[in-house]
Amino acid sequence: VAMLQPCNTIMFVPDYCDNCMEMHVSLQQFDEHAHGALVDRWQVYHGEPPDVQWALVDIDATRFHEMFIDGEGLCRENALKDIERTICKTLNENKDAVRKQCHKETGVEVTDPFVVGVDPLGIDIRAPFGIVRIQAPVPFASSQQVMQYFAIV
């Protein structure tokens, strides 16, 4: 997360509803040179930020209705992280397939899709207006499943 100052950090929740989960988080500042991969990943999703300080966000706890959940119980690593870069590269070489699937699943027309992330629950595509998320019909367990979903042989 790019942040200005910890005391000035605000999380904006556009719509509150009865099924919202409230989170208590902690920010831990880090040096962008020591953790360049994290900075690169953020920039792939969001573009070049202004002069900022960088922070990791840890979920301390959450509340959902009357339940309180420890943050560690919500943190999972991306099971596809070791092959994510290869999947993104292959999908970005097949923009027509990504464009068609994006429109079919979300109704959003993305003229120049750029896949920036893949996890078992879906695919993130950067568009000129923001990130479009395609939910996986069933959790992806392999790159082959992702390619089959996009009809890439």
Task: Place the predicted regions along the sequence by residue.
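Binding-site signature for planar aromatic cofactors or substrates
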Residues: 1-153
